[in-house]
Amino acid sequence: MEFEHTQVFNFEGALRGMRNPLNSWHKSDSATWVDCDMDDEYYDEMIYDTGRSYFNDVEMPATEEEQDALDEAIADKQNYLMDQARMATTWGEHATVRNVIGPNDMKLAKRLIAGGGEHRKFLRQIFVSVDITAPLYWWKEFDTYKVGTTANSTSTMHKLASTPITLDCFETDDYNDMVDIFNNPSPMEYPLHDFISCPDGLLDMLESLRVKYNETKDKRYWKELIRWLPNGWLQTRTVTMNYENLRNMYHQRKNHKLTEWHSFCEWVEECLPYSAEFITDKA
């Protein structure tokens, strides 16, 4: 399973709209800028100033130990914000949009998130685009999430017969050809292909159908190829979603028995800005 070309859009618009109900735009303290590959200290200073602002209400330390602890906390926050700023949406080859959320906006965002779906509408305005390559059996589950998601897929109907069918065309990340076949007091492990000619026999059959169809253009061969194609077949889709979709998917699927959902949740945690605060609740 692969995730490629992840892009995140519209933090600025979502956070601005978040403040519309109370006309509190003047309280916004987040920063958004376009970085055109310039090594400008201004960007770093902006991030570090934002990091310090999280601690403006903290009392002055009374001891050296308290000062050291405060300095460490500020440094941790600054480093975190710097990491978040690096996870950015690329526009063209040399321009990058970066977002750093200030403490005022973060406090309001968390309060709205805790209030439930009717209050956290701003999450629906943070958009994500990603290319996902996954097996058909996972896509069948993903397709239950229809509202707010759109996917453009590579075509099995049009392109299935255009390239050789090999094991690489299927999901095999956790494939194990040794399975416990019999349910008895002393279960034994047997090679799966000894019983159902998988995977070599199945691959040979599919490839033979593909070749025969290309030779004859007889659609009966193509139909049998479609009929017997396993659910492990890998398909790539360009998917657009929003943070509210992703929040629902993450919390509903994080303990799912399909390992592909675990990979999906790891992508959310590791690749999406502010996922800990807005999606996973791990902040």
Regions found by a protein language model. Give the residues of each.
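Family-specific signature for flavin-dependent thymidylate synthase
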Residues: 1-283
